Amino acid sequence: MGRVRPRYIKSLGDKLLEMYPDRFTDSFEENKKAVAQLADIPSKRVRNRVAGYITRLVKRRKAQEKAEAAA
């Protein structure tokens, strides 16, 4: 099982994804750069955790859209 993310990681990730949905992809490296540009996050660890959470959300949305299209 994976780790549970703190609320501040989820809320920041959700806010960034809502404000800039076209800036994020299913690539962690690209999302990491986008988070660094869009948000003022002082620590690398928090930036990476937010980018990882956003990557997971984008992948989940794509899989859900693919499943709905197949059904």
Curated annotation (Swiss-Prot):
Pfam families: Ribosomal_S17e. The keyword Cell inner membrane does not apply. The keyword Phosphoprotein does not apply. Gene3D superfamilies: Ribosomal protein S17e-like (1.10.60.20). PROSITE patterns: RIBOSOMAL_S17E. Keywords: Ribonucleoprotein, Ribosomal protein. GO terms for molecular function: structural constituent of ribosome. InterPro entries: Ribosomal_eS17 (IPR001210), Ribosomal_eS17_CS (IPR018273), Ribosomal_eS17_sf (IPR036401). It comes from the Archaea. One of its GO terms (biological process) is translation. One of its GO terms (cellular component) is ribosome. HAMAP family: Ribosomal_eS17 (MF_00511). Belongs to the eukaryotic ribosomal protein eS17 family. This is Small ribosomal subunit protein eS17. It comes from Pyrobaculum neutrophilum (strain DSM 2338 / JCM 9278 / NBRC 100436 / V24Sta) (Thermoproteus neutrophilus).
